[in-house]
């Protein structure tokens, strides 16, 4: 149990720090879309696809690694709450079309990247 707590905690701390770094480096580049939030979600989508498929193919890997990568690292990196706050800000600003576009872009890209992550493992496993 303690190893699981450490795995999630350390992974979450590292993922959150990486998300913070992406926000600092990318959010100021384009005022219409916070690119740091977008990058965090898209990267997390891809890595979680790779991780889910990889761990499914290697069940002998200790469950703490799954907790570290998926629950901790990618949980800390991906940011549904920040994404939600940014969309609500667009709605409050009366930018309904922009808010809808942001939803489609974030969710669509994250799903596509997760599928690509799973496909990557499938292709590399042949």
Curated annotation (Swiss-Prot):
Bilayer topology annotation: Multi-pass membrane protein
Membrane-crossing segments per the record: 4-24, 35-55, 68-88, 103-123
GO process terms (BP): cellular detoxification of fluoride
Signal sequence bounds: none
Domain of life from the UniProt record: Bacteria
Keyword Transmembrane helix: yes
Keywords from the UniProt entry: Cell inner membrane, Cell membrane, Ion channel, Ion transport, Membrane, Metal-binding, Sodium, Transmembrane, Transmembrane helix, Transport
InterPro entries assigned to the protein according to its UniProt record, in alphabetical order: FluC
Catalytic activity as recorded in UniProt: fluoride(in) = fluoride(out)
Residues engaged in binding Na(+): 75, 78
An example Gene Ontology CC term for this record: plasma membrane
GO molecular function, one term: metal ion binding
Regulation: Na(+) is not transported, but it plays an essential structural role and its presence is essential for fluoride channel function.
HAMAP family named in the record: FluC
Family (UniProt): Belongs to the fluoride channel Fluc/FEX (TC 1.A.43) family.
Role: Fluoride-specific ion channel. Important for reducing fluoride concentration in the cell, thus reducing its toxicity.
Annotated protein name in UniProt: Fluoride-specific ion channel FluC
Source organism of the structure: Paraburkholderia xenovorans (strain LB400)
UniProt lineage: Bacteria, Pseudomonadati, Pseudomonadota, Betaproteobacteria, Burkholderiales
């Amino acid at each position: 149990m303690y190893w699981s707590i450490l795995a999630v905690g350390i992974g979450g701390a590292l993922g959150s720090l990486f998300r913070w770094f992406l926000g600092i480096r990318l959010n100021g580049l384009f005022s219409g879309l916070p690119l740091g939030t977008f990058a965090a979600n898209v990267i997390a989508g891809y890595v979680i696809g790779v991780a889910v498929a990889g761990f499914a193919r290697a069940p002998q890997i200790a469950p703490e690694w799954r907790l570290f990568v998926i629950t901790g690292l990618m949980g800390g990196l991906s940011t549904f709450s920040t994404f939600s706050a940014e969309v609500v800000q667009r709605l409050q600003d009366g930018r309904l079309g922009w808010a809808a576009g942001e939803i489609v872009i974030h969710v669509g890209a994250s799903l596509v990247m997760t599928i690509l992550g799973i496909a990557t493992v499938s292709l590399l496993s042949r």
